[in-house]
């Protein structure tokens, strides 16, 4: 029934009266093909941080541009939100994009085809500069206020022939918004890669013992796996794996699981640790890492020695900007100035970062979810980045439990 989508309409109504989208929320609904989780990316300067936290988990970005007179122009202007959001999504590795041309009811005249075409042309040229390919992007005219063209074609826009996308791995076409969501390509779930499972929490459960939980990002986890927790280097055997209170014979990427480990106390593990397979490309702590960062909204200058908090996967750790190596062009990544004294809002740079405490990260190329981060300071996100390379620590001073030794011996 239509009430399932009432949130989107009610929310847009309330916010239209207030005039602005601010809070971040996780909304879930279903289309014919997918369970969709919407991570709201609010269109207001101070709230870009809300977007970043969610964007690291997104498979597709939906960029909403307002068609109202003057409103679209403000969003796409030199320092408008539309530009910033699209650039952030691309930088953080969200390669699929849908553009919703909203508030079609407030164009002059209402539901104007010319206005839609004008916006489509302008946004296409902008997203192309960022790195998106406009022919692979669905442009969908909608009115959230009245629900036009969101679930089914609208009688107010009879002129609409529909949207088309052309992609190497599958074309798509349709008219309304929900069909554009159905045309998203499901992300590859990397089961053939090494196991990486960042921990958001660790529980102690009576009669069972220590149960770390988290979402598998890559690889496979099953009972009997001898896991290592980086950066602490604790090795132990997995006794059982559960999802939604059911035992699994194996967990795959995307699964949110709890798994029981032997001979490790809950005090030894913490949020931000990463579980991997001790025998197959195991995770390690980082000595330092090189990243490309984009400064979003820092009131002053950032120079060598600056030590904000980095949010990377489930870890929150202070890291020092040990060396700002070069300023680079935001789009091409080419160097424009070597060893700059400082960087400021709007700049992109290659920097070497040094964690103040043990931290496990990976290059974006190899493990995307462990290779992108937000830089936080003064209760806001001041920069975002992707990791280009990591200098790993030597795995010394580690704890290997008896269960791990036994499991390892038995498998020789």
From Swiss-Prot:
It is found in: Cytoplasm. GO terms for cellular component: cytoplasm. Residues 1-191 form the tr-type G domain. The modification 5-glutamyl glycerylphosphorylethanolamine is found at residues 250, 323. Its main location: cytoplasm. PROSITE patterns: G_TR_1 (PS00301), G_TR_2 (PS51722). GO terms for molecular function: GTP binding; GTPase activity; translation elongation factor activity. The keyword Phosphoprotein applies. It comes from the Eukaryota. GTP binds at residues 40-44, 102-105. Belongs to the TRAFAC class translation factor GTPase superfamily. Classic translation factor GTPase family. EF-Tu/EF-1A subfamily. This is Elongation factor 1-alpha. It comes from Rhynchosciara americana.
